[in-house]
Amino acid sequence: MEDSKIIDLYWERNEKAISATEQKYGSYCYYIAYNILHDQEDAEESVNDTYLGAWNAIPPHRPNMLRTFLGKITRSISLKKWRDAHRDKRGGDEVSLVLDSQSYHL
């Protein structure tokens, strides 16, 4: 299916837009997500989140190049997921305090 027809389906809020997107760009989006996340399950989740992101963005946005539009959404979602996973490994949102000898004396 042509990109313009897929975009029209999104614009009409037709759920066939998601299946058409998956059929045409699913492997492309998965490739992007997997190369960032290196985990099959996380990559699949990012791709599904990409479809939701496209659904929420079209309308009002009507992308000129659907492939690029989806790639940017996938990349953004995957990078956020990667950062969240690695932040947790570093201690999450905890702030560690380093006390030197000067700050110890109050």
What spans do the regions from the language model cover?
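Acidic, proline/glycine-rich intrinsically disordered inter-domain spacer in sigma factors
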Residues: R90, L97-L106
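Sigma70-family region 2
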Residues: W11-E12, H38, N48-L66, D84-H86
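Arg/Lys-rich amphipathic alpha helix in sigma70-family domain 2
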Residues: R75-D93
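Short, charged helix-capping/linker segments at alpha-helix termini
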Residues: W11-A20, Y30-D49
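Acidic, Ser/Thr- and Pro/Gly-rich low-complexity regulatory segments
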Residues: E2-I6
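Residue-level preference for hydrophobic side chains embedded in well-ordered alpha helices
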Residues: T21, Y25, C29, T50, ...
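Alpha-helix N-cap and coil->helix boundary residues
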Residues: A20, D42-S46, M65, F69, ...
